[in-house]
């Protein structure tokens, strides 16, 4: 025998930061053994957005079930695990608490190491299921609560080089969708409508020419709402496909142009797309096209659709990196809705 066999690392991931209750078993940080997600979309639909109290109640109902199902699908017991990773923040405090308390209880009962994970680090590490990371790399993180350009020079080293100064892109999508009378979650509906529309309204592209890599979407959102109201006051009903296409073109132009410029400036080896809005077809297609043209030497990594939204596999992936670096969280770990990525 040529030396000892390397032991696999098996981590249980738990995610409950917003409106998905999820658990997953991941091997070596890059192989999903099981992934279970209980979504609450139907419960929040009639309110047009996530209601924190309802989200927390659903997490309480689902958390034990999803953990049991993840272990069952992976065909493992708690004794087979090396550790537990859980989303510590950011997110809704009541929702986070359910996952954190479940993780702490299991870790205590089974004498397992506990690792707190930043939700956005999870979204970034979802790309580890596609390929190994090569540094330096740049992540465009786009979700309901975050729009950031994150530079990484090593594992678990995050530098935010650009972020939104007001609304996150996903938040703007949801608000615009509500104005059009579309069902929650609005981003998916806008993306679908945009496929059959044209950019006829030419909405503003904020901060495009500034040297900064920061974003702003509040002006675009206001411009969209005002345009829609003005047309309706004149008795006109605008083409929803064109409205959606015009809005999406503005968002995608800004996101892609700043990302490409940042990737060039920092001479990155890989460019990653991460977060819920990474599922947006318009954004995915445009990024693929621009990287081919502008950054032929840079590897573009886009996660599969199943790993764009909130899930626990990504938390286990990020948690594995921290676990192997020797990082541990104590039983005094609490939900931290304001947790900063650069502080982890």
From Swiss-Prot:
GO CC, alphabetical: cytoplasm
Which Pfam families does the UniProt entry name for this protein?
Answer: TsaD
The biological process GO terms on file are:
tRNA threonylcarbamoyladenosine modification
- Write the record's keywords in alphabetical order, separated by commas: Acyltransferase, Cytoplasm, Iron, Metal-binding, Transferase, tRNA processing
> Might you give the EC number(s) for this enzyme?
2.3.1.234
Give the top-rank taxon of the lineage listed in the UniProt record for this protein. Bacteria
Where it sits in the cell: the answer is: Cytoplasm
Signal peptide bounds: none
* Binding locations of substrate: 141-145, 174, 187, 191, 280
Broad class of where this protein is predominantly found? cytoplasm
The entry marks the following residues as binding Fe cation, namely 119, 123, 310
Reactions this protein catalyses:
L-threonylcarbamoyladenylate + adenosine(37) in tRNA = N(6)-L-threonylcarbamoyladenosine(37) in tRNA + AMP + H(+)
Record-stated family: Belongs to the KAE1 / TsaD family.
Biological role stated in the UniProt entry:
Required for the formation of a threonylcarbamoyl group on adenosine at position 37 (t(6)A37) in tRNAs that read codons beginning with adenine. Is involved in the transfer of the threonylcarbamoyl moiety of threonylcarbamoyl-AMP (TC-AMP) to the N6 group of A37, together with TsaE and TsaB. TsaD likely plays a direct catalytic role in this reaction.
Record-given protein name: tRNA N6-adenosine threonylcarbamoyltransferase
